[in-house]
Amino acid sequence: MAPLNVEVIVGSVREGRMGRAVADWFVERATANPSWNVSVIDLRELSLPQDFSDSPATEVFRRRIGRADAVVAVTSEYNHGYPAALKTAFDSVKHEWRAKPIGFVSYGGISGGVRAVEQLRQVVAELHMVSVRQSVTIHRVRKQFGHEPYGVDSIAIDASEKMIRELDWWGGGLRMQRASDPYPG
């Protein structure tokens, strides 16, 4: 079977963000899986238009999500919610999300971004995605990712391994199903 194409989306675009460091940590873990082909979409670099107009950035995003077999959203939590740039990304394309699994890597202070993930699960359900049960939560992100080498706790490491297995299972199954019987939604 061909490797799964997995897109990791960095959802925060703020100055001083920790999202890229967290995403790079997850990508390092994910690329250890030989059945995955992992790419990163950094929303800070892509600059999707907020008015959802067609643009070269939107077309690039549409193609990459269309080719993906699974998605991982790396999200911070701002004021008990997820970043606006991430919502713009989800709203910028439509059919490309359908019948694909998604996992979440969240980070923040004491809550670790769990409230952002709770809200995102509702959004992706409306997009006809399958949210895997396991997520990765990075509590006190500046303590764990503030300097190299990163001191990520064992709970997050274990969660990442479980989430990768779940995404692998769903990604392979849904890819075969989409190929044999296109999603009717």
Regions found by a protein language model. Name each.
Residues 96, 144-145:
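A short secondary-structure junction motif
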Residues 102-142, 154-159:
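Short, glycine-/small-residue-rich phosphate/pyrophosphate-handling segment
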Residues 1-93, 147, 151-185:
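N-terminal beta1-alpha1-beta2 submodule of the flavodoxin-like/Rossmannoid cofactor-binding fold
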Residues 88-95, 122-127:
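A glycine- and small-aliphatic-rich helix-loop capping segment at beta-alpha/alpha-beta transitions
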Residues 98-100:
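His-Asp phosphorelay/catalytic-motif detector in bacterial-type signaling
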